[in-house]
């Protein structure tokens, strides 16, 4: 039996009450003609020469059990078997087939219908011939009701489909997106609607809504039209570039920024894309050289171009140092072995490496300290702090003193010039370095620096109050005693003397200062 398909709004033609449906009964094709055929079949069944014969009682009657089925004439059984008519079938859908089969058999062959046995009348079922007129009327009524229901549902389906595929207004769509509902944007096909969508989204200041509209425009518009619409919408451009940055699409971001006129940002993005070759200078240096003569050649990128040149020179110095120190056979390498490669590290790391392992090299050597300082322009303060840190680790205290002393009159004038500019500089060094920072670097780079070296650094501090503070901070008892004696603060000196170790040199100096009658105490 064919399965009955479920009615759906999307495909109402497949409903079981449709006239063209394969599952519909034969009675629904032409109900009036079927009724006429049914009446004719009834007349043929009970009319003409086929009248029932009188009943003849058998000679040897035998009681018929109630549970034994009634016996029918052989001719009637043959006709029933030949026509495959199941009289007890009560299905309304099978009634049409019964009548059709019976009529075909009736007109095809001249079959004599067996007389009806009077003693055992048959039970009239819903699908029997006598019930066909009333059954047809009932089916006709049901069919008309189903047609009316089908027409009503079809009209409702058309209304729902019209409302479903009718696009909302742009304001309503943006409002639904802000509320978190699903909105179909494919209905907005014109360029005007898409432009209005972007403007309305930007006006909401909601990044999620702006991002959805931008992705929709990118998917449905050509690249030049998309960039033209995005130009002028800073919020949308910022959201889109952030998305490209997260996904790592640097080439696409570079192309987009150039299309909207942001050449400086595009150059920076192009430079950021080369960071993946940070440890591979053979690939990064050619790219940097191409960018230097390309996107970084505009006047607005002059400062960035100088930084790129310094980066390329740093790579060259690092490659030369790595080539020279391939064996690591020097004394410093045995005492302080290398822990990692120098390639890809900042320029200050190259300077520290040169001061650490090549401080005594000839100035003409590519890895020497003067050569590195010549190729890469460092800030004086940063360069001095870096070199002092390397020399402190090597415990080269005389070299540090020599480095900190002013070498020329020009350096002395430069230090004095910083004072006139309002910069506080109380140290005696020729470079603009703070004594506090200098002592911090020394303490950090060496576990136990000599006390006399720290004392010499503090001696160069011109401010007495700052000198006392640094002496207490870095624990230089000799300088603390000297400062308190100069101030004439007897109570502070007596309190500090109690904190010193008994019978130590510093303790004897503090007691001697307290017992000195020539000192004027406050």
UniProtKB/Swiss-Prot annotation:
InterPro entries: Spe-39. This is Spermatogenesis-defective protein 39. It comes from Caenorhabditis elegans. PANTHER family: DEFECTIVE SPERMATOGENESIS PROTEIN 39, SPERMATOGENESIS-DEFECTIVE PROTEIN 39 HOMOLOG. Interacts with vps-33.1 and vps-33.2. Associates with the homotypic fusion and vacuole protein sorting (HOPS) complex, impaired by vps-33.2. Keywords: Cytoplasm, Cytoplasmic vesicle, Differentiation, Endosome, Protein transport, Spermatogenesis, Transcription, Transcription regulation, Transport. Disruption phenotype: Mutants produce spermatocytes that complete meiosis but do not usually form functional. Show defective vesicular biogenesis during spermatogenesis with morphogenesis failure of the specialized Golgi-derived fibrous body-membranous organelle (FB-MO) complexes. Show disrupted processing of endocytosed proteins in oocytes and coelomocytes. Expressed in spermatocytes and spermatids (at protein level). It comes from the Eukaryota.
